[in-house]
């Protein structure tokens, strides 16, 4: 059976791994998942990520980050889902926790944070919130 929402699965795997204080989490890879991992790394929410080939299938390994024994990512929430897509124009892009968190937006220029989308003046699909 195929997975209906691989991005929600990725976010859930990260949340579950952090709940049991794993050092890293492994999942099937895709271009969108790698782009999300790159944004998370650029924003300092994860240590590193790597894509490896195993038996013709690529896997994404994400190194999780902790501070004072607690996960750096406190909130990881899927916004736009396959059954209900959420699009925001350039003037409607949401702020997460008044700017303390990040919204990951899929724009025509690629995946970026809410701050960068506002600065660039583009809107798009709100993938998830991270705080």
Curated annotation (Swiss-Prot):
Which GO terms of the molecular function aspect are on file? rRNA binding; structural constituent of ribosome
Matching entries from PROSITE patterns are given as: RIBOSOMAL_S8
User: Is Cytoplasm one of the keywords?
Assistant: no
One record GO biological process = translation
Q: Which UniProt keywords apply?
A: Ribonucleoprotein, Ribosomal protein, RNA-binding, rRNA-binding
Query: What Pfam families would the database entry show?
Result: Ribosomal_S8
Q: Which GO terms describe its cellular component?
A: ribonucleoprotein complex; ribosome
Can you state the subunit structure given in the record? Part of the 30S ribosomal subunit. Contacts proteins S5 and S12.
The record's comment on protein family reads: Belongs to the universal ribosomal protein uS8 family.
The task this protein performs is described as: One of the primary rRNA binding proteins, it binds directly to 16S rRNA central domain where it helps coordinate assembly of the platform of the 30S subunit.
Full protein name? Small ribosomal subunit protein uS8
**The organism's taxonomic lineage, starting at the top:** Bacteria, Pseudomonadati, Pseudomonadota, Betaproteobacteria, Burkholderiales
């Amino acid at each position: 059976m195929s997975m209906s929402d691989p991005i929600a699965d990725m976010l859930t795997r990260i949340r579950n791994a952090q709940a049991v204080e794993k050092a890293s989490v492994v999942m099937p890879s895709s271009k969108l998942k790698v782009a999300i991992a790159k944004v998370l790394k650029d924003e300092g929410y994860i240590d590193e990520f790597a894509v490896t080939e195993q038996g013709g299938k690529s896997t994404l390994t994400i190194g999780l980050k902790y501070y004072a024994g607690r996960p750096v990512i406190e909130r990881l929430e899927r916004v736009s889902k396959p059954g209900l897509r959420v699009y925001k124009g350039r003037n409607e892009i949401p702020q997460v926790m008044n700017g303390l968190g990040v919204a990951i937006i899929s724009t025509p220029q690629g995946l970026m944070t809410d701050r960068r989308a506002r600065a660039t003046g583009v809107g798009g699909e709100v993938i998830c919130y991270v705080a």
